[in-house]
């Protein structure tokens, strides 16, 4: 099977999964594993890969996401225990006193927490810091969960440009440049991005304010019909432990600090946090078992999606098919447009984020585009900057990014709704950043 045919099969696989997700044909886990299995069967049947090779690709793919899956299970359990114990009730009460019914203030607070939380460059830890803290406030004010995610992913996309962030380091390594040097060059675009992140919070905060004012009491019924609040509805007051509030706050802060310091694997931090939280707040094996079971369904549902996404990534990414997809895409760029390569790839970066995982995008597509750009005298750094800045805007709405599923799982939003709600806005933000880069002289053509 030729490289072009392999690439076309890869595109067909990705498009099939996206269509199944957006049309709500089935749950994400089944979409990932069924389509990936069909593709794997075709690859083995045509002799492109042996059965052993394909098994190895799938194993590597699942291995690459299993940490995120375990992290999700125990993070859901940890924050569930803290919610049962009543810790968030007091925190929410304090926040509500500060902001009252100031919807715009809540949106800005979300942006601030996401920006600070993403200083470590970790998408999972930022979602774990921001969403559990802000989601109860959004529910109390009847703000949409999709808006919470939109504000989060906008701020996170901008902060993901730090030199210790994965995308910047990957791009710098490909063009053989120091990450700090690349970051200094793109910093003006990041500053514009931060302004846009704050603007996003203000704009969508005002939109939520108008929506709530317009619908009035009817909004309660609308939210009840749209969201399943069975996981956080009427809590069992018998599980509340107000006397342990200080301990629970200290434990939560300790978990977050250790996460940011990156001393231990994130999932292990939450395992220990769960153990301490359950043992200190509750007594008896029966109660421990009951609490774990009450939160198991949410954790296992999303963990299964993440693991099945690992199968998808294994079949396409570990096999090298995504790299072949990148080569085919680059071959369609007309020679007459070669010098405009940074602009072209900048405009297309958000849609491409839905097709390529981070490694394939930077290690597969970037080297090919740099080679093409060299033929037209295009500075490799300008191509890298356009790809890093514009692509980051869509990192956390991509169905091939494991952290995306952690975020939507914590917020209780379907992947199709998340993409539909955020895609247009994130694409707009990326184009504004690109235009700013051109105006400020960060990118030349």
Enumerate the language-model features and the residues they cover.
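Long, contiguous bundles of hydrophobic transmembrane helices that form the permeation core
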Residues: 1-14, 38-42, 47, 184, ...
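Membrane-interfacial loop-to-helix junctions in multi-pass transporters
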Residues: 4-8, 63-69, 95-109, 140-148, ...
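Re-entrant/interfacial helical elements at transmembrane boundaries that shape
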Residues: 90-92, 124-137, 165-177, 325-327, ...
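Transmembrane helical segments that form the transport core of multi-pass membrane transport proteins
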Residues: 250-355
């Amino acid at each position: 099977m030729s490289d072009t045919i392999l690439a076309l099969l890869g595109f067909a696989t990705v498009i099939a999964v996206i269509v199944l997700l957006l049309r709500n044909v089935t749950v994400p886990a089944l979409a990932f594993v069924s389509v990936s299995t069909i593709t794997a069967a075709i690859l083995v049947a045509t002799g492109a890969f042996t059965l052993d090779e394909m098994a190895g690709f799938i194993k590597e793919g699942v291995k690459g996401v299993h940490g995120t899956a375990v992290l999700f299970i125990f993070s859901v359990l940890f924050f569930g225990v803290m919610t049962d114990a009543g810790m968030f009730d007091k925190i929410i009460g304090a926040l509500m006193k500060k902001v009252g019914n100031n919807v715009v203030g809540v949106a800005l607070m979300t942006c601030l927490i996401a920006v600070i939380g993403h200083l470590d460059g970790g998408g999972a830890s930022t979602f774990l810091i921001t969403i559990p803290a802000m989601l109860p406030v959004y529910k109390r004010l009847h703000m949409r969960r999709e808006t919470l995610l939109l504000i989060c992913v906008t701020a996170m996309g901008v902060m993901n440009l730090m030199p210790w962030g994965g995308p910047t380091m990957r791009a710098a390594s490909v063009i053989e440049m120091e990450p700090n040097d690349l970051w200094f060059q793109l910093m003006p675009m990041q500053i514009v991005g931060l302004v846009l992140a704050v603007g996003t919070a203000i704009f969508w905060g005002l939109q939520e304010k108008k929506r709530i004012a317009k619908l009035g009491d009817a909004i309660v019924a609308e939210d009840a019909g749209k969201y399943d609040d069975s996981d956080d509805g009427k809590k069992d007051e018998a599980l509340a432990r107000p006397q342990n509030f200080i301990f629970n706050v200290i434990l939560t802060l300790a978990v977050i600090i250790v996460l940011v310091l990156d001393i231990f694997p994130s999932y292990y931090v939450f395992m220990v946090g769960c153990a301490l939280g359950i043992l200190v707040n509750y007594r008896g094996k029966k109660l421990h078992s009951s609490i774990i079971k009450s939160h198991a369904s949410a954790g296992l549902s999303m963990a299964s999606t993440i693991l099945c996404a690992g199968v998808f990534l294994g079949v396409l990414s570990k096999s090298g098919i995504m790299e072949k997809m990148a080569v085919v895409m680059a071959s369609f760029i007309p020679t007459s447009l070669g010098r405009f390569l940074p602009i072209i790839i900048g405009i297309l970066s958000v849609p491409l984020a839905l097709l390529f995982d981070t490694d394939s995008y930077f290690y597969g597509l970037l080297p090919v585009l740099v080679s093409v750009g060299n033929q037209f005298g295009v500075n490799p750094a300008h191509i890298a900057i356009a790809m890093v800045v514009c692509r980051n805007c869509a990192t956390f709405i991509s169905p091939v990014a494991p952290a995306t599923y952690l975020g939507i799982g914590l917020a209780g939003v379907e992947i199709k709704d998340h993409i539909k709600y955020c895609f247009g806005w994130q694409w707009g933000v990326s184009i504004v950043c690109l235009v700013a880069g051109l105006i400020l002289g960060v990118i030349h053509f």
